[in-house]
Amino acid sequence: MSNENNAIHGFDVNLICDFFLNTERQGPGSPEVTLKALSFIDNLTDESLIADLGCGTGGQTMTLARHAPGRITGLDFFPGFIDRFNADARRLHLADRVKGVVGSMDALPFRAGELDLIWSEGAIYNIGFERGLNEWREYLKPGGYLAVSESVWFTDERPTEIHDFWVDAYPEIDTIPNKVAQIHRAGYLPVAAFVLPETCWTEHYFAPLAKARELFAAKYPGDSTAEGLMAFQRYEEELYRKYSEFYGYVFFIARKPNPRWTPCPGATPNSGATPSSGATPSSGAT
C-alpha cells in the first residue's frame, strides 16, 4: 500500500464505523484482558455506576456486565454501534442494567462525582490521552477507578516506517513511563499497568477483520474509497507483524484519590503497581 493515505483519519469516519459494525471489537483486546483489568478494581456493588466510553459495538462491555455488578452505560458517537450494543444487551438478558447511548466523549451525560468506574478500551485516543484523563476525572467519585487501554512505544528508538506511521496516526503515542507520569499529573493514583499480549491483535482483532472485509466489499463493490480503507487495514496488519516488538497496547488502571483515606506510614505519591522504565512486551498479560 502506498504511504500517501496511511493514517486512519484520512478516511470518512462514517465509512470507518460502517466497516467495523460487523465486528465484536474495534481494536486490540480480548475477554481475558478485560477480566484481568477488572481484577484490579475493588468495591463494585449492585449500586455502582459504570461508564464504557467509546464502547463501539460493546464486546468488552458485555464481558464486564457478565462479571461485574452495577449498572453500565456504554457511550459512542456512532448510532449503528449503539443499535448493535443494545440488541446484544437484550439478547444476553443484560438490558435491565446495561444500556448504550449515543454521545460524545467531550460532552459526557453524567454528573460530577457520579461514576464508580470509567472504562475505555482502545478509545481514549479519540479525545487524547491527557485530555481524557483530565476531563473525565471530575465524573468519578472519590476513590473511583479509571481503566483504559492505550497505544504505547515499548522502546525509545524504532524503525522510521513504524515511527512515522504512528506519529501521523496518533501523535500522543508515548512510552509506558511517560504515560504513567501523565496519569500522576492528572491527579490519579496508578494501580496497575500491563501489556496486552499479541493474541489481542492477531486473534481477536486482525483475524475477524478478514470476514469484515468480505462483507464490506460486497456492500461497496467497486468503491475506491472503501477499497482504500480495506487496503489500510491490511497495511496496519502488515506493520504489526513486522514491528510488534516496538509498540502495542497497555491497560492502565488508576484511581481518583479519596480525601478520607489515611496515608500509610512511608507512603509516597508514586506508590502503586506501575511498570518500570524498562517495561517490555514480556511484562504483559498471559
Model-derived features: where do they sit?
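Conserved alpha-helix/loop element of class I SAM-dependent methyltransferases that forms part
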Residues: G27-D46
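Class I SAM-dependent methyltransferase SAM/SAH-binding core
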Residues: A51-L53, T57-A107
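A short acidic, Gly/Pro-enriched loop at the edge of an enzyme's catalytic core
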Residues: D106-L117
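A short SAM/SAH-binding and catalytic strip from SAM-dependent methyltransferases
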Residues: L117-E130
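A short glycine-rich, Lys/Arg-flanked "PGG" loop and its adjoining helix->strand segment in the class I
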Residues: R131-Y145
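Short, glycine-/aromatic-enriched active-site segment of Class I SAM-dependent methyltransferases
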Residues: S151-Y170
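Short alpha-helix
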Residues: E172-G187
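Conserved Class I S-adenosyl-L-methionine
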Residues: A192-C264
